[in-house]
Amino acid sequence: MNMAKDIKFSADARAAMVRGVDMLADTVKVTLGPKGRNVVLEKAFGSPLITNDGVTIAKEIELEDHFENMGAKLVSEVASKTNDIAGDGTTTATVLTQAIVHEGLKNVTAGANPIGIRRGIETATATAVEALKAIAQPVSGKEAIAQVAAVSSRSEKVGEYISEAMERVGNDGVITIEESRGMETELEVVEGMQFDRGYLSQYMVTDNEKMVADLENPFILITDKKVSNIQDILPLLEEVLKTNRPLLIIADDVDGEALPTLVLNKIRGTFNVVAVKAPGFGDRRKAMLEDIAILTGGTVITEDLGLELKDATMTALGQAAKITVDKDSTVIVEGSGSSEAIANRIALIKSQLETTTSDFDREKLQERLAKLAGGVAVIKVGAPTETALKEMKLRIEDALNATRAAVEEGIVAGGGTALITVIEKVAALELEGDDATGRNIVLRALEEPVRQIALNAGYEGSVVIDKLKNSPAGTGFNAATGEWVDMIKTGIIDPVKVTRSALQNAASVASLILTTEAVVANKPEPAAPAPAMPAGMDPGMMGGF
């Protein structure tokens, strides 16, 4: 059964949506800048969440009026999209959307053609984005990375953790954020490739106290077959034995007489050998074995390639500087694979990441990428209370995303300053009629983040903007101290990717709202009357269960 619909047209439709845009944007924009305030979100269970993270707040907002709610949801979409692309800048995106919608609406109401305005907005936005990229400064080196992370998280300590993590595992490495048991935030790094499979027999350990097997400069046999018959691998074992180096066997399983034979040789000291099961399942297992082979310079011995264990030679074995195996996991450090082959494999996984639609696949591909690229770092977040912990975790996630974005596309002066810097380029666009109106709307919107940051810190926005326009490039207003400073030197910076995504997403959704002519919403259903009680039934009886 289709629900009845409520429909609003042109000015009515836009006005209702703008009310929703305003409700959401006004709630989110109080968090912008160093003096941004917090917003408290009620949670159905547990303590309320206190946050200044734009996208978290935007996702919580649900309005009663269907038309207003649609406006709010569109802005929430801008915040989410910016968060997905750049991981930060959600509040800036919200402020820009609101500014473009308001300026645009004035002109549409006064009779301008929304399609012309939209064209102008798109042209101006593209010009602003090019200008931002042109003034970007690259970020490299531990100090620069620490500075970017410290600005985003408002904590120098967090900045140090993130730059340390990125230095240790590389820019493509996986950095995860977990909750710590204690009060302190700390960093743990697993270098090399780790997978969740331990030794098949505890008699294979080399250190009885720690119960781990350390293999220095080992050979690695990689196969998706079961090893049950020792005769299958005997020729290989004899060759490895001559080199006096240890061997790691990664196989579907090692059982039958093969396992006790290997263990016996290990105990006698003839031969240092450790066997582990292959990681993953199904197709993912094949891909992971291939990753290990590429990392170590070996070949996967598999029927898919028509290879048999008994025919394998030393050239099929991978090598590494060191391997550590405990009862649950194996870590391969410094595999001997060619850096070119590893780079090609990383590029292949990255292209699969771009095309996959499944979140689960994306997560698994990301893990494989990290393992090939250099390791996994875990930042364990500690805080005195649960509420503080949640808030801290969100801040660190933001900082990590902002830092990655900065390394990718460079940085510009923060605090909305860069958006004012590009005004000159946008103003120079020669456009006519409604297109020119669209450009002017963007020009006005580019001032809005600075205005809001100043307002939140208790300063007069227009005064700050006027002074900023007449200041040398790179000089900006530090809202935390009220001083005029060289923004980048002071460490007040924004990743270009964040600023650019915020502007592009805001312009895109705001122009959609301006070109809306009708809005269709579901009519609220009248509440169904409560069923009458059967005669003679005592209402008190209902509570007896």
UniProtKB/Swiss-Prot annotation:
It is an enzyme of class 5 (isomerase). ATP binds at T31, L32, G33, P34, D88, G89, T90, T91, T92, G415, N478, A479, A480, D494. It catalyses: ATP + H2O + a folded polypeptide = ADP + phosphate + an unfolded polypeptide. One of its GO terms (cellular component) is cytoplasm. Keywords: ATP-binding, Chaperone, Cytoplasm, Isomerase, Nucleotide-binding. One of its GO terms (molecular function) is isomerase activity. InterPro entries: Chaperonin_Cpn60_CS, Cpn60/GroEL, Cpn60/GroEL/TCP-1, GroEL-like_apical_dom_sf, GROEL-like_equatorial_sf, TCP-1-like_intermed_sf. Its EC number is 5.6.1.7. Its main location: cytoplasm. SUPFAM superfamilies: GroEL apical domain-like, GroEL equatorial domain-like, GroEL-intermediate domain like. It holds the Pfam family Cpn60_TCP1. GO terms for biological process: protein refolding. It is found in: Cytoplasm. Forms a cylinder of 14 subunits composed of two heptameric rings stacked back-to-back. Interacts with the co-chaperonin GroES. Belongs to the chaperonin (HSP60) family. NCBIfam families: GroEL, PRK00013.1, PRK12849.1, PRK12850.1, PRK12851.1. Together with its co-chaperonin GroES, plays an essential role in assisting protein folding. The GroEL-GroES system forms a nano-cage that allows encapsulation of the non-native substrate proteins and provides a physical environment optimized to promote and accelerate protein folding. This is Chaperonin GroEL. It comes from Streptococcus pyogenes serotype M4 (strain MGAS10750).
